[in-house]
Every structure is written in C-alpha cells, then in structure tokens.
Amino acid sequence: MSKYDVIVLGSGPGGYVTAIRASQLGLKTAVIEKESLGGVCLNWGCIPTKALLKSAQVFEYLKHAGDYGLKVSEYDKDFDAVVNRSRNVAEGMSKGVQFLMKKNKIDVISGYGKLKAGKKVDVDGTEYSADYIIIATGARSRELPSLAQDGKKVIGYRKAMTLEKQPKKLIIVGSGAIGVEFAYFYNAMGTEVTVVEYMPRIVPVEDEDVSKQLERSFKKSGITIMTSTEVTAVDTSGKGVKATVKTKKGEETLEADIVLSAVGIKTNIENIGLEDVGIVTDRDKILVNDFYQTNIPGYYAIGDVTPGPALAHVASAEGILCVEKIAGHHIEALDYGNIPGCTYCSPEIASVGLTEAQAKEQGINIKVGKFPFSASGKASAGGNTEGFVKVIFDAKYGEWLGCHMVGAGVTDMIAEAVLGRKLETTGHEVLKTVHPHPTMSEAVMEAVADAYDEVIHI
C-alpha cells in the first residue's frame, strides 16, 4: 500500500492548488482524479466559458465596427470553431496542471476515489493511505424535478458549452452567474434568448442597482427577461421544447429549441465513502471547522463541498490555509466577508462586501457613492459607457463596507476594493490615493469622492 503525507481527492482549483502548496511545504502528496486534471473550473467552467465569451465579444465588436470608424464588409461566425477554440483553451490549461504536478513531484492517481476508515482511500480496488486526506470533489449542475435534464433538449452548463448546433431559440432557467453568462454568449451569437428567474430580479445576490443595470443592458440587447416566474413543466415530445411557466398573471407556454437549466449546483459528496468513515454532513455540505477539519481526525474538506461560497478562488484559498495548518503554520481563518464575486457577461459584474440593502438592514449609518462610466473618459474612448461603480462606507468610521461594479472590465478592477477592505482602508484614504488617468479604475476614486460630496466629474 502506497503511503503519503497528504492525499487530495479531486483536482479542481481547490484540489490541485492544495496539492501544490502541500508539496511546497515538504509533504509527500498525491492527487486522485477521475476525469481531467483541473476539475470543472478548468475543463467545464471558469476557463472554457471565458473563451466562449471572448468569441462573443469579438463578434459584437465586428457588428459595431462602424461605431469606431471602421468598415467591415464581410464577417460571420463559425459556431463549431468557437466551441472548438473553447475546448482547446480548456485542454491547454489542463495540460498546464499536469506540468505543475510533475514540477512539484506530486503523484497523480487516475480513477474514482472512495474514502475508507483508517485514513485510506480506495481507487478502483487499490488502496492508498495518508496522514491527512483532503476532500475537494466539487459540485455539478443541480437538477429540479420539473426540469429534468436529458442532455438533448433540456441541458446543463456542460452541454451548453459543446452543442453541435447553435439553437435559434433558447430558454435559460436561472439568472445567477452561469445563467447570465450563457444568456450574453448565445444572444451575442444570434440566438433568441429568454431568461426565466424565480426571484423578483435577475442576479438576485447582487446589489439591486446592479441587477437593474444588467436587466436594462440585456433588454437593450434583445434578451427577454421574465422575473418572479417559475418553470412548472417541460414538454420535450415535439420537435423542440415547450416550457410551462407560472407568472404573477397566470400560466403561459414558452417554446424553444433548447432549455438550459442554470439553477445552481449540487455537491459531489455521494458515493465517496463519507458514511463509511462517519463524516458529518448537513444539507449536502460537509461540516468543517475554521481550518477545514471534519469531525473525523485526519479528514479535511475544502471548496464547494463545504458551506462557504462555491467559488474557485475560495476553494484555492481554503486549500492553502488547510495544508498550512496541517504543516504547523500559525494561520488566520479566512474572512468570508471579504470574498469578491465576478460574473463575466456583458456588462461584467464584480462585487465585494455588503450591498446597500444589507448595510441598512444591519442598522449602519452609511455613505453611498456612485460614478457612472458614461462620465469616464476611458470608457467613452472605448465605447463602453454602460454601468457604474458603487461604494458603501460606514459614515462614522469610514470603513469600506461594500463595492459593487457593473461595466466593461470590472472583474479586473474589484481587487482594489478587496485589498482596501483587507487593509482596513478608510474612504478618505482611497479618495487621496492618486489613480492613473485615463483608466476605468478612476471610477472607483470618483465613486468614493461622490460618497464624500467631493466628486469632480459628475
């Protein structure tokens, strides 16, 4: 039986980053993976979807070339080539993880791993043992009883990335990050898209102003938005799909070629031996302490399978802290109140901290500032004037409570707010920090200036 210091079950952004950090700390490490290295994120999530979205963005620029003083007489899309480019990008990233495994002398064990008592893992009949076993098995597309996926007419996000034929009409159920990213992609490529959302507004976890802006932008692009709407049944017996939806006005039937279910994720914790070992779960999540230890000594869990936010960067951060604790380092628990969230539709969304509504619900006296990209020189020059930056501060102490952005490239801007909050930067300190001109990031400074009644450009 092969013996390791650390065995990581799963090789997504949680698993492979955990393994690399463990190896850096001098721990003999193995990773068990049943599919491709990199997990859902690199192969079926974060990375390939961004490749699809980039193709859509380039296609959009070609459509609007005249707005930039350019004449493009002929242009067209090749849907197969767009999909193939996305898959090639994903495969390249997975090979990159393979390289990192070799570089860091990490053993990669291919197969289905199942936990056993005594700090062991069975992989297709072969047993491996370790002093510490870290569960990082991630999650998959969640299915609703009224929206069972058949992989043909009712699909999940994986199939949506590799369709053989572009649908003329698409219904997307759910308007979280997955839903709105695919809504933008398919709409930009020429598909007639309808987004159905059960909650009163799209991207419901975001600040309400952000939701309103995205809905305006989507409607302007020709995307149909149906909020406070529930899909009660789907009929796939005909050529396409008929979806029965319940609205405030009653029931109606929507028709499309395909329905994409984007109603969240379900953790991959079944049939991995949790019950055999005695690891405690609650509502499909493995319960852990601040350092990701389960109730059974020697067994840890990170990423989507735990109660924290199901985000790749969270899984990576948790994994690093987990193995640093195992190695005896003195570490601080992760601050889950300062986790950025990014959505890569167009316009993009990025946020961190409290929304305005949440701050008010907590009874905090706040200062709120907002700066529209329509007043930004860089945004105007680039033709990307939709959206804004919104900041929220504690009125008494100047604490940066929240930052919410919607617009072109904002996912690359949010780190300023995350770092500022980490360092307990006050509003006045941000305001007095010189931002380069002309940049999109100036909007952060201007939004802060607006909160303190010192804004210059609006």
Question: Across the structure, where does each feature detected by a protein language model lie?
Answer:
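Beta1/beta-strand and adjacent pyrophosphate-binding region of the FAD-binding site
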Residues: 1-12, 168-176
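Hydrophobic/small residue at the entry helix of a nucleotide-binding pocket
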Residues: 14, 38, 178
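Gly/Ala-rich phosphate-binding loop of Rossmann-like dinucleotide-binding domains
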Residues: 19, 23, 183, 187-188
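Hydrophobic "anchor" residues
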Residues: 48, 121, 267, 294, ...
